[in-house]
């Protein structure tokens, strides 16, 4: 996995959790 991918995933999860 690439660090950039992990960063994107973290943002995606945060948005989903906020929803």
UniProtKB/Swiss-Prot annotation:
Keywords: Cytoplasm, Stress response. It is found in: Cytoplasm. Its main location: cytoplasm. It comes from the Bacteria. GO terms for cellular component: cytoplasm. Induction: Constitutively expressed, increases in stationary phase and at 45 degrees Celsius (at protein level). This is Uncharacterized protein YpfM. The gene is ypfM.
């Amino acid at each position: 996995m690439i660090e950039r991918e992990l960063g994107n995933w973290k943002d995606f999860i945060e948005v989903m959790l906020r929803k």
